Structure formats: structure tokens, C-alpha cells
Amino acid sequence: MQEAYIVSTARTPIGRFGGGLKEFSPSDLGAHVMKAILQRANIPGDALDMYIFGNVLRAGHGQLIPRQAAVKAGIPQTIDGYAVDMVCSSGMMSVMNATMMIKSGEADLVLAGGMESMSQAGFFLSHRARWGYKFLLGKPEQLKDVLEYDGLTDPIEDEGMGSETERLAAEYGITREEVDEVAYYSHKRAAEATAQGIFKTEIAPVEVKTRKGTTLLDEDEGIRPDTTPESLAKLRPAFTSDGILTAGNASQISDGAAALLIANDAAIKRYDLTPIARIIGGSWAAVDSWRFAEAPIPAVRKLAAKHKLDVADFDLVENNEAFAVNTILMNRELGVPTEKLNIYGSGISLGHPIGCTGARLIVTLLTGLQNEQGKLGLASLCHGMGGGTAVAVERL
């Protein structure tokens, strides 16, 4: 079994919903990080064996969005690739699939990541529109929101993920004060990291054309440095009338892309690459669909057991803040201390472009390990319909 190494990373700044990246399609965003990572690694596109990218909200954007992105990035059309849809875990599973290709000897060099434009998610009519409406009496046709229907709703329970998380929070006895505290520290940490220039090594700035000219977007748009516990406490519940979750302690709807270049020893020697980290392995697990926020817990336990590790062995942990509840569960159930968890913020402050985040977490984890001189890192996240994934890395 061969080893798989991360040799380069890149991500876009994360754009707010309807913000600076709203005119960029998912393939535009993907192309940007593909091009950036090849430039950073100083290799041609034809060196790749494959590209694998996560994407969820693809309706109306055409066939095989990662291949569209690759062509835009100048990767030769003789290099093929595919998309992964595992909802929020899409980007992470893309990295895991690339790792499996490398370790099995099927590929030497694979580009993996995720891309999502939640701002460009459209609306759709049901199949009834194709065959004609004979009568609408009693059966009105409504436009459905692709973002809500394909991205944020559990079809098994026919329930939004926010209200499902409210149910889980009630079961665990999680309070409004606890989730607001998570949100406060998320913004505080992200704002401090941005002010210190920590994300500059990750972000490939994007030129944004406006009526006033061209501007350079080089920072994440969703961070609110002025967030306080008092301002969070004033927000109304977002999903249930008496709930604890608000727009302030749930992840942001966002746009963005992230990529990692994964290589074996042969590719490293052939192209004179410098490995950043070794991918120890990945895992996945699933629970009842409405309990999705719990799913990273068994995924992490499975990963740790397989590689004879303890959760305490990891120097840093990135677990996506789909909701602040996720952070509390990682702390309570796995014993991850807050000083190791999401040290630069996460989905609440940085944003959560769903098909991208799984890859973005690994990119940011590597930044943290480098800055903190840590050795072992863990990235994990939940995904809609009850699943979760986890990846462990060793910084070199």
C-alpha cells in the first residue's frame, strides 16, 4: 500500500450569500482553485491522473461541473474527473476517494476538493410541467427552491435541518447561552486570524468585477468582528418559535471552492514536489437522518480505532460548525477541548458552502498545524440525511 501526501492547497475566500462571489458559477469557483493550486505546485495540468470535486447544488449548471471547471482552468481535456455528492461531506469524500486511488496504486497525482455557489442555486418545477397541467384545481404547482430542497432539507423526515438540530439540542439539554458562546468565539477567532494574516497562505484572491471597476476579494466575507454575546442574545429563533438556534449561531449560506493536490512518492520525485502532510486515513459513519449532527462522533471513533489513535492524540481538530450544537457535541462526547477545536473559526463565522467545506476544513487544518507546530490533525463534519466523515493527517 502506497502513502498519500498532500503537496499543495488552495481555496477561494468564502463569499457571503449574494455577496462578492454571487456572479461566479460553481465551475468558475472550481476553476479558480484548480488553476491556483497547479501554479503553486508548479506543475502542468497534464501531470494529473484525475480530478475529483464535491458539488451539491448542480441543477441547471450543466453536465459534470468539475470537468467544466477543469477545462476553464486549462487542464487538458484528455484528463478526466468526476463529481461527488455527499451533501456537506462532498469535498471531504473527494479527498478520501483521491487518497484511496493513490494508496491502491491506481493513480500517482490527483486533484481533489469541492466547489459550491449557493448564491446561484435556482428554482424548479416538478415533473408535472413536462407532461402538461390538465387541472390545477386542488393541486397547485409551486416553484421549489433548489437551495432549500436539495441542500437544507431532510427528505426522509421531510424536515429542515435546523429544526432537526433543535430536536437534538433539546435531547442533550443544550442551552441558548451555550450555542451563543460558540458563535461568539467562532467570530472572534476568525476575525483575529484574518487580522493576523493567517489565511493568506490558503486563499487565492478572486478578482470581482463591479460597476465601479475591479476589486480584489482576498478575505472571507462572513466574519463579523463586532459580534458580542449581547448582540447574539438579541436574535430571534430561526427554526422553531421557542428554539435556541438563530441566524447567529448557525452556519452561513456561502459560496466558495477549495482544493488539495494529493501525490504518491513517485509523483513527488517526478515533479520535485514538497509534501505538506501525510494522509493517515479517512472514515465515515451514519445515524438516523434527523440526528445528523451526531454523525461525526462515530466517524471519528471509527477512524481513531482503525489507526490505533486516541482523540487526545490530535493536536488540532476542525469540525464544521453546521450549527453551534456540533461544537458542543464534539466537546461533550469526544472530549475535544475548545483550545484545540476550530481555532480559526468555522462555518458560523467563515461560512459553509456545502460542497466545498469538507475540503476547506482540511486546508485550514494544515494551516493551523503549521502555525502551531502541531503533528497530528483531525477534520470532520456531518452531512444531511444522517452521515458524517473524518480525515486524519500528519504534518511533515
Residue ranges and their predicted role:
Residues 164-166, 199-202, 209-210, 280-349:
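Active-site pocket-lining segment
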Residues 26-42, 65-69, 94, 161-168, ...:
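Short, well-ordered amphipathic alpha-helical segments that serve as non-catalytic structural scaffolds
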Residues 11-12, 22-32, 40, 178-265, ...:
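N-terminal extracellular/periplasmic Venus flytrap/periplasmic-binding protein-like
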Residues 22-110, 115-134, 203-218, 290, ...:
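Conserved beta-ketoacyl condensing-enzyme motif
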Residues 109-167:
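Flexible glycine-/small-residue-enriched beta->alpha junction loops
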Residues 1-25, 143, 229-294, 298, ...:
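Condensing-enzyme catalytic core mediating Claisen C-C bond formation in acyl metabolism
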Residues 55-110, 142-144, 155-161, 226-252, ...:
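Conserved catalytic cysteine-centered active-site region
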Residues 86-116, 169-198, 259-266, 331-332, ...:
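Active-site-proximal alpha-helical scaffold in enzymes
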